[in-house]
């Protein structure tokens, strides 16, 4: 638990429940959920909202049939999503123990729909507080894969996952936001094989959990435990491409590329960049070595022109092809520069005002998991239609396909780090959190759309801001660092990173820029409107200012953006984030209702004022 007492936490939630109509106070901002593992219970009473994609998800024999890894695509793979056996609740074994052999499942088991969290409606389980989660399914290896290695891949499992094949432990992974996989070839047999996944997820403060809470309410939401992204098998060679690290170097008209292959002896790499199907650059070299792929006269990626180059990478040994993958990349730069004496974020050498919504990434039917791939894309498409050019992904890491759509649609992304509350005071939790954050940065470093890493939010589980800013800079010197979003909720500002970030509800307000730090408004707005029939909890009034009509909330939104236009011109404000894309459980702040069925604001009117702010008109 955090150093903050349960009594103080309860008082903070009482304050949140009052839904203040003035600027948010530090007391609200530092409120945290009480996170003690508890008995298995049904989710708190609420309306079981469906989305336009719920029926499709329920009927799909294999949910999310799309290839899950757009920047490392292989043509052969086997999707393991769908119905699995499930064993959870009080009788399930402790998944932390991870014995060498999988336990015997009961004769009668429940069924769970993968990859939806067990707390979600779409999973078919829909229970809260199941700490030990055991999954089982059978599979057969296609005959065409004979003679090759077989890897099993997981998009994400929250929080500690142990994998078994045919009863034998394969490996373990900790961290609910990063992908992982194992070579399972030695354990396979002809015909039917058995896969068991054990997940331990107490949803407690000693691990990264974002805005999940065992006692959801106000600005914290229902947890998402266990498997919540796609599971799949793929055949590979003994030597194969494991990862591509790509960094555009616009000033030198090249892509810095490293092809991770693990085994490197005798391996040669060829990478080819294509523009509209035509080869524009080629490089050959060794695996696991830094390569420079020419991209002459690059067409630069931006929200106005989100152009992406195709990339084909081939791995050879003694002239023979041993692996080949398809990928893509965008050419863009992001840096801090002075414009008329004001520090500004420069995209491709030009100041672009960054404006977008706070995006929580929750769904009433799937929680952390969107019901379908089309739904995953929908939120970003609508963000673009609203005239925004960026999105702040709030304290959650999305599947790779979400970033793929941000890349394709042209949305700048601020990526938050999921916090662990206890990292503030517990050094062991802090060390584990830092490891997970390094894995997140490493996993996402090739995504074109990500321009800013956000380390801490409103002092939640925070520690050593300046050191962490330096650490993120060392991990990735090519992006902007926001060491602490909402510095007005911290005891003090250590001055790290590239941004000085204020939160103001309903606002807006602007911080004073510094010679080395850009002034941004990391959160504001939170304008609320009830839409009967589309509310997760009909009695909710959350949060910050509740309007009584669509006309009133639209007028308030436009007035707030007009103020931002003045702050851009007079106070050097360079970015702003409005809360939020959609309603989330008790929160009623969205452009859409939580079920994505009702637009709460006038999108045409919003788009016009948003574009005027971005364009400086």
Regions found by a protein language model. Give the residues of each.
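Surface beta-strand/loop "capping" patches
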Residues: 235-264, 344, 614-617
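Bacterial N-terminal signal peptides
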Residues: 11-26
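Accessory beta-strand-rich segments of carbohydrate-active enzymes
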Residues: 87-89, 125-126, 130-240, 264, ...
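Bacterial N-terminal signal peptides that target proteins for export
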Residues: 2-14
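N-terminal carbohydrate-binding accessory modules
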Residues: 244-246, 312-383, 612
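Beta-strand-rich binding/interaction modules
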Residues: 165, 253-285
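Extended carbohydrate-recognition surfaces in non-catalytic/accessory domains of CAZymes
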Residues: 36-153, 208-220, 224-227, 236-237, ...
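Substrate-binding/catalytic cleft of secreted carbohydrate-active enzymes
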Residues: 380-381, 390-605, 609
